[in-house]
Amino acid sequence: MTSIVEALVPGGKANPGPPLGPALGPLGVNIKEVVEKINEKTRDYNGMQVPVKVIVDDKKNVEIEVGTPPTASLVMKELGIQKGSGNAGSEVVGNLTISQVAKVARMKKEDVLSYDLKAAMKEVMGSCVPMGVNVEGMKAKDCQKALDEGKFDDLLAGEAW
């Protein structure tokens, strides 16, 4: 029987404590070894929470799947901030360029429901709203409308999905 443990861990800094240790202990695997593999695979996401899936088969073989961090974490990393606004309607904590939005959308390509770059960018902008993050100096909702109207088509002409 295969067991699956899913957890959100700090990139490159997972440890044998909760949530991994208590979940992996009963499965009889070498927790230290699993944690080292997770840290190796998540090193590029340092400072962000990263979803990981540890799959243990009945022969104690371990497979680790690493997801992408939540969109909010990627946006905060792009802006170099620690947290979003506590008062998103009136407090702005940062401003993304349209290229940064496209970059985050491409990073989330495997996780988003969108079939093209523009739609994925609108999903990213939707995550910016409750964080108090503007895009190109506009409220994220207004920037979504501008994107629909083709305002950024010339900037996105060379952007690949």
From Swiss-Prot:
GO biological process: translation
Alphabetized InterPro entries for the sequence: Ribosomal_uL11, Ribosomal_uL11_C, Ribosomal_uL11_C_sf, Ribosomal_uL11_N, Ribosomal_uL11_N_sf
GO molecular function: large ribosomal subunit rRNA binding; structural constituent of ribosome
Transmembrane segments: none
Quaternary state and interactors: Part of the ribosomal stalk of the 50S ribosomal subunit. Interacts with L10 and the large rRNA to form the base of the stalk. L10 forms an elongated spine to which L12 dimers bind in a sequential fashion forming a multimeric L10(L12)X complex.
Protein family according to the UniProt entry: Belongs to the universal ribosomal protein uL11 family.
HAMAP family, alphabetized: Ribosomal_uL11
Protein name (record): Large ribosomal subunit protein uL11
Gene (name only): rpl11
